[in-house]
Amino acid sequence: MNSAPRNAGAARSVDRRGFIAACGLLVLLVVRMLGAADATRIFDIENIPVVKYVAVAGRNVTLNCPGVTEHSLVDTLVWRTSQTIAEYVDGGLPLVSSLRITLLPDNFSLHFNPAFASDTDEYSCLVNDRHSPDALVDLLVQDVPDPPGRPLVLSFTSRTVNLSWAYTQDPRNAPINNFVIETRVGENGEWDQVDPLYTNSNEAFYQVTGLVPFTVYSFRVIAVNELGHSPPSKESYYFVTLREAPTGKPVTTIAHNTSATSVYISWKPPPAETILGEFLGYRITYRARDKGTDDDVKEIYIRDSTVESHEIHHLETYTQYLASIQVFNPEGLGPPTTVLVMTDEGVPSKPLNLSVLEVTSTTIKITWREPEKLNGAIHGYRVYYVHQNQTLLHLPILKADAAVNSVYTYTLSNLKPYTDYKIIVAAFTKKFDGEPSEVSQRTDISGPSAPKVVNLTCHSQHELLFGWHIPQTYYNTIDYYIISYRNLEHSEYKDIRLTANSSIVETSMIIPNLTTNMVYEVKVRAASASVINPKQIILGSYSEPKKISLQLHCEKIPQPSQRQVYDDYNLAVLGGIVFSCFGLLLIVLSFLLWKKCFHAAYYYLDDPPACQGANTAGLIDWEAPCEVAGEVRGPIPVTEFAKHVASLHVDGDIGFSKEYEAIQGEALNDEYPSEHSQHPDNKGKNRYLNVIAYDHSRVHLRQVPGQKKHLDYINANYIDGYQRPRSFIGTQGPLPGTFDCFWRMIWEQRVAIIVMITNLVERGRRKCDMYWPKDGAEMYGVIQVRLIREDVMATYTVRTLQIKHTKLKKKKASQSEKLVYQYHYTNWPDHGTPDHPLPVINFVKKSTAANPSDAGPIVVHCSAGVGRTGTYIVLDAMLKQIESKGMLNVFGFLRYIRAQRNYLVQTEEQYIFIHDALVEAIDSGETNIKMDAIGGLVNNIDFIDNQYKLITSYQPKEINLTSALKSVNAIKNRSSLVPLEGSRVHLTPKPGVEGSDYINASWLHGFRRLRDFVVTQHPLIETFKDFWQMVWDHNAQTVVLLSSADNMSFLQFWPNESEPMESDYYRIRMVSETSENNYIVRNFVIQSIQDDYELSVRMFENPMWPDMANPRSIYDFAVRVHERCAQYRNGPIVVVDRYGGFQACQFCCISSLAMQLEYDQTANVYTYAKLYHNKRPGIWSSYEDIRQIYRILSYMPKDLGLLKCTELRTEFDDAAIMTATPDLYSKICSNGSINTHLNSGDGGGNGNDGVPTGNGTNGGLPMSGGGTTTAATIQNGGTVIVKMNGEDNDELSVVVATSNHLNLDHNQS
């Protein structure tokens, strides 16, 4: 039942309270002469005076004895009513009837201390045994009344009740003015004493109005007289007001489509006090927006009040629906909440009236009308044609701006003559291809090829005998021959038309009526009747014209030059054939010898239509369709790839399982020799026993003089890329015993890029050994490797290494050094595959693009050099195939490269990840935007809107929100913006307290680190301590506050300087508060209560960020925040806005993208925005949010310097290293450079590429960071440089490059 408070607007009686403010005893003396004696008097004496006293109960009152003064002689005195009250006899003590009563000795007045209402009476004072008093004393003592009787409920409705009660038993000498009625809501509620009801009169009846339906009430009554309020009566018996239809609306939280025919709606119920009856459930009504009649409305009743979501099915495709949700109780329905939701695009129906308009030998022109049911926004039409079971796709035809039922035409060209084609046309939307319409058509014939003339001789002096062979190529039949001849003295030909028979191979005829001793030119061509229009004759090509002089017994005129060319050509062909046969013989012999020596195991399938096995990888065309395990698989157009991947995902990824099993099955059947890997001297060079290098594709190290042959071995294989043989070298993570071999391979193969996709240790197991120097230079055999710089980013690190061959001859000294770049991906999880493919795609693109065109292969390794290595190589090849051909063949390429190194793409999970990553790559396209192109995209609404839709496409499931949706945590959330389970920030849990590890906060990555930011809502009063617990637990020393505190919903959650805040484990106090450039900076210290540890925290409050009117201030604020963070780079930056949404995430985005722009002059807005959405869905509400990020980036100043203080690196020589505190760092580094009180050195520095460009000795050492170098000289010329160490650059080292002393403010040496 409802327990809502009583309506404040209920009607009440007019307030007529009586009030007496008695500050002392009120005595009213009235002396009057009465003509008749009162019936209650003790003395029935006429005309006796009466003295009246009126008193208030609880106060003192004194009655004077009439006629007695201080000078009166009193022997006896008696005060009495109906009984004696006090008595006095001369010489004795006064006698009184009550301890409250005193007989005053001065004038024998009767004193009551205090007086009660029961003391009301008529008193007489008899002196010296008189029979009658001088006057009667009338005492009236007034008091608050007794409580009325229990109120009774006479009748009631949903909002009123009629009450009646018994009057008070004793009004206590003061009439009842009115009554006060107090109300209680619920069986155990509080009485409403602050705002009770007042009656207008002293009637014992009242109608209470303004009640809440279906609510438990009880009442009590208080009587009111001039003296005040009586005690409350007994409360009435409980009753429940009648029901009414609900007044509250549900609140819609989610409304989106789930398919082309269904939508999903979720809601929160209205407040319980608005249900006004038993909560029976919900009614959902819906209709298409464009259909406004009541007949079209459909309804669904959900008779379960706990349900808060529903999916509506069987809707029309791509249609806007108005859906209304109402609660209902037994009295009826509440007001509706209406939401507009649209079903998804579906499959368009068949195009109408597909037919053939025109046909030629190489073209077919078709026409059609748009489908009857569009089921979406038609983007265009795809035209396929099938020939000999091979399907080909013509380019999509974009939809023209035409009226409904417009006619489309399209011409298929480059077809083969006289060939049957099945033509398929299907409309397509953004998401689906529609149902196809089909038509079959045979192309027309083309003209026959030229006949071959075999005879031209004189038949007589007036006739020629002319013979020819049937054309080598013709279609259907040859119906006619046309012989053309002319006298060379005339330019015009004469034609003779013969009916032909295709079954006759050689035809001869006599050309009559010629002139003797004339030269004639004769040629012939065939002709065929069109199969489309039999009346049309299609002419073929002419034979080569032949010349002859007509005379008796003549011969064909020789043509020396042409004949000579023909003979020379024949000789060349003959010579080429002989040479080719000889070369082929050598190849066969070489192959047999090689097979005998190395036992190569190449096999070829006997069935020509099927694919060659993967064991012929060097010979097969992996881009062509082929049949494997009874299924034909081939390249897939990019427009079809997402649909293809979705089909593989159905039924628990069964399609992927089948494909991967087919690849695995081939690998088991193929046996490639790997004798060098199995050699006893080489087994120790293999990290894993079962991961070996095939002999036919392995990398051979160059022979060192005097070295055994097997010492040319390294566990590495050449692997082809897309249309580039030996594009990669796949290898294992180097072992300590193979470091020298690894670097020899890098040198000999002219490698410029090394790709590493593993961490050194994963899940406690050694995956790879550190084969590069941590600082300075190391020797690995004959190769010296020096670490030049190290750029650490969130998901990968780029190291610049200088390698030098120490054994090259002096004349080649200039070629003995070169730079190698190691791209080290650090975010591949220990188990499985990455959460999202975007960082991997970006890494693949960046690392492969860095390889110079004249460099050797890219070396790729993980731990074994097969799983992640194969994934990387397949992704690169497919991205290039997409760019080149607009299609891709993952299955075929993986089969192909598995013949070059075993186990590439080691798990089915990796195989699935490749497909999902390529779908993302196709959908998103190129997302790295160059700096000079950002401004042009701000007004490209279509581009930004498309990005926004892709960015926000992910919708979390309830399992992803387990902690956030728990009832114990629901009160900690301000809005529907809540953290996902995989990215939420955890607090230290309190034993036995459910939900104590929860706070509405999410981890977000930045440019440098995966956990660079914590985004959270403005704390609620219930979560103040949780917020500071998070800061304490995660060592967060920088807080950015983008919301402002008010006195209503968003309260101040930090302590003032005079009032510290305490928790069970720590104490927070404010140290200072200052204003800087439109923002406030506060410094806090959090001290541990249990041990000697404290944490300094700085808060930057800037509720006006971003100030679009002053773009420079946007970046200055970000720089200021990151400067502070650079001083104490242990924990994340905590970013707070009202709901942990757009503003906070925008700050993180802008900060990270500004660093990326400084680093490589590109910005990947799409990647940051999408990964942020995937960790905290709902932060981007419209495409304008994304557009504003582009707009802010377009204002970025070139001299920002945001990267300068985030990380300092240097090349190390033989300098001594000592640890420095963050305070020393802040003294040395300010705003990204060495502080001015440390003098800059003058020596050599770095060029823009981080390579030392000078040779100074006492000057600045090369430092990397902003691309320039600075060193500081201190005290007696010593030089100091600073380096950030540690996995997250959270250790600071100071390097003293000379023997001079370094004086520090701290106690360090």
Curated annotation (Swiss-Prot):
E.C. no: 3.1.3.48
Keywords for the protein's UniProt record, in alphabetical order: Cell membrane, Glycoprotein, Hydrolase, Membrane, Protein phosphatase, Signal, Transmembrane, Transmembrane helix
CC annotations in GO: plasma membrane
Principal place of residence: membrane
One MF term in the entry's GO annotations: protein tyrosine phosphatase activity
Reactions listed under catalytic activity: O-phospho-L-tyrosyl-[protein] + H2O = L-tyrosyl-[protein] + phosphate
Segments on the Cytoplasmic face: 594-1309
InterPro entries found in the cross-reference section: FN3_dom, FN3_sf, Ig-like_dom_sf, Ig-like_fold, Ig_sub, Prot-tyrosine_phosphatase-like, PTP_cat, RTP_Phos/Ushers
Disulphide bonds in the chain: none
Biased composition (Gly residues): 1256-1268
Induction pattern: (Microbial infection) West Nile virus infection does not affect expression levels.
GO biological process, one term: anatomical structure morphogenesis
Domain Tyrosine-protein phosphatase per the UniProt entry, residue ranges: 656-921, 944-1196
Transmembrane keyword on record: yes
Listed Pfam families: fn3, Y_phosphatase
Subcellular location: Cell membrane
Membrane topology reported for the UniProt record: Single-pass type I membrane protein
Leader sequence segment: 1-36
Transmembrane segments: 573-593
Positions annotated as glycosylated: 60, 107, 162, 257, 353, 389, 455, 501, 513
Extracellular side: 37-572
Record's protein name: Putative receptor-type tyrosine-protein phosphatase mosPTP-1
Gene3D superfamilies registered for this protein in UniProt: Immunoglobulins, Protein tyrosine phosphatase superfamily
